[in-house]
A protein has these predicted regions:
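A short hydrophobic beta-strand segment most commonly corresponding to one strand
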Residues: 43, 88-90, 103-117
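Short acidic-glycine-tyrosine-enriched beta hairpin
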Residues: 77-94
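Residue-level recognition of conserved beta-strand positions in structured domain cores
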Residues: 67, 75-77, 101, 109-111
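A short, N-terminal "cap"/entry segment at the start of jelly-roll beta-barrel domains
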Residues: 1-47, 51-54
């Protein structure tokens, strides 16, 4: 495979990295998918799945886009429910968050820059 292009399947490729497709955490052997600039995740969450504890001290900007399902996002600024295909939320550095899949859900998460935690 060439270093500057890649074609794949998000569900299949994400199985190795908890859904993450791009980011600093992918080894250089992953070519163009190894990035310090951006992280991309294909998240498949069954109803009831969630992160109850808050993700704190976040230093990246994030967009979470609902592909299907119903997904609750709890931010330090309030609670928001993404329920229509294409609904999304964007938050910047310093915003704490947790989440809960209210129905079987698929979401795309993009964070930048890609930073070690």
């Amino acid at each position: 495979m060439a270093d500057n292009w890649y074609v794949g399947n998000a569900a299949a490729d994400g199985k190795e990295n908890r859904g993450w497709l791009l980011g600093h955490f992918l080894e250089g052997s992953n070519g163009v998918r190894a990035s310090d600039a951006v992280e991309v995740k294909w998240g498949t969450h069954p109803a009831g799945d969630g992160r109850d504890s808050w993700q704190t001290d976040e230093q990246r900007t994030t967009i979470l886009l609902l592909v299907k399902g119903r997904f609750r996002l709890d931010l330090s600024a309030g609670t928001f429910v993404l329920e229509h295909e294409g609904d999304y939320a964007v938050w910047g550095p310093g915003m704490d968050h947790s989440w809960h899949a209210e129905e079987d859900s698929v979401v795309i998460t993009v964070r930048w820059p890609s930073l070690p935690v």
